[in-house]
Amino acid sequence: MGTVVAKLLLPTLSSLAFLPTVSIATKRRFYMEAMVYLFTMFFVAFSHACDGPGLSVLCFMRRDILEYFSIYGTALSMWVSLMALADFDEPQRSTFTMLGVLTIAVRTFHDRWGYGVYSGPIGTATLIIAVKWLKKMKEKKGLYPDKSIYTQQIGPGLCFGALALMLRFFFEEWDYTYVHSFYHCALAMSFVLLLPKVNKKAGNAGAPAKLTFSTLCCTCV
């Protein structure tokens, strides 16, 4: 019986894989991204908890609303991670971020279970990044960004992201509990790898202000 209960709770517990992602994003001064990851983890955890045995008391919202925000948060996390990788200056950064916030909300409401809810943001972000980087390469007549970014950050990050989506859409029927839990872990790892080592746009006038985990929680709530 204990094994059955543990198996049912595993998707909920595996959503905690986003906690290190939140912590790392905060340390790298990607505060907005950290709040999005925390938002995603919160709704993913409660969405799965509502399916758990005897945990219906945790369903503080309707099941479909929890599902909506868990999927919306996941897609938005992909978008903000890729926009952080693009390293835009203002006002492009806030403009593209808000573009994702609005369009992903509409797309998720229209069809939250299709491939498009994830492929749309990923494809659009990839196109935007490609245009910017190709322009940079043309200006400097060389590779942009550095080769190490491709080998240590982009390559591994995209591999884990591709693995996560493959698990999500093609292998969950094998064993939903374990496959979906690995999906959470692969997705969280992808976000960590894609985030730059430091947010250059956060300012460098002295030491950055401390943003605690409790502050992030209060902001999201």
Curated annotation (Swiss-Prot):
The keyword Lipoprotein applies. Its main location: membrane. Residues 1-3, 51-64, 111-113, 175 are extracellular. It is a multi-pass membrane protein. Pfam families: DUF3522. It is found in: Cell membrane; Golgi apparatus membrane. A lipid is attached at C217, C218 (S-palmitoyl cysteine). Induction: Expression is induced in muscles in response to muscle injury. Expression is induced in muscle progenitors response to muscle overload. Down-regulated by in microRNA miR-491, which binds specifically to its 3' untranslated region of Mymk leading to its down-regulation. Disulfide bonds: none annotated. Residues 25-29, 86-93, 135-153, 197-221 are cytoplasmic. GO terms for cellular component: Golgi membrane; plasma membrane. The keyword Cell membrane applies. Keywords: Cell membrane, Golgi apparatus, Lipoprotein, Membrane, Myogenesis, Palmitate, Transmembrane, Transmembrane helix. Disruption phenotype: Perinatal death due to an absence of multi-nucleated muscle fibers. Mice are observed at normal Mendelian ratios at 15 dpc and 17.5 dpc, full-term embryos are alive but are paralyzed and kyphotic with flaccid limbs due to skeletal muscle deficiency. They show a complete absence of differentiated muscle tissue in the trunk, limbs or head. Myoblasts can activate muscle-specific gene expression and differentiate, but lack the ability to fuse. Defects are caused by impaired lipid mixing of cell membranes. Palmitoylated at the C-terminus; palmitoylation promotes localization to the Golgi apparatus. One of its GO terms (biological process) is muscle organ development. It comes from the Eukaryota. Specifically expressed in skeletal muscle during embryogenesis and adult muscle regeneration. Belongs to the TMEM8 family. PANTHER family: FIVE-SPAN TRANSMEMBRANE PROTEIN M83, POST-GPI ATTACHMENT TO PROTEINS FACTOR 6. Interacts with MYMX. Myoblast-specific protein that mediates myoblast fusion, an essential step for the formation of multi-nucleated muscle fibers. Actively participates in the membrane fusion reaction by mediating the mixing of cell membrane lipids (hemifusion) upstream of MYMX. Acts independently of MYMX. Involved in skeletal muscle regeneration in response to injury by mediating the fusion of satellite cells, a population of muscle stem cells, with injured myofibers. Also involved in skeletal muscle hypertrophy, probably by mediating the fusion of satellite cells with myofibers. This is Protein myomaker. The gene is Mymk.
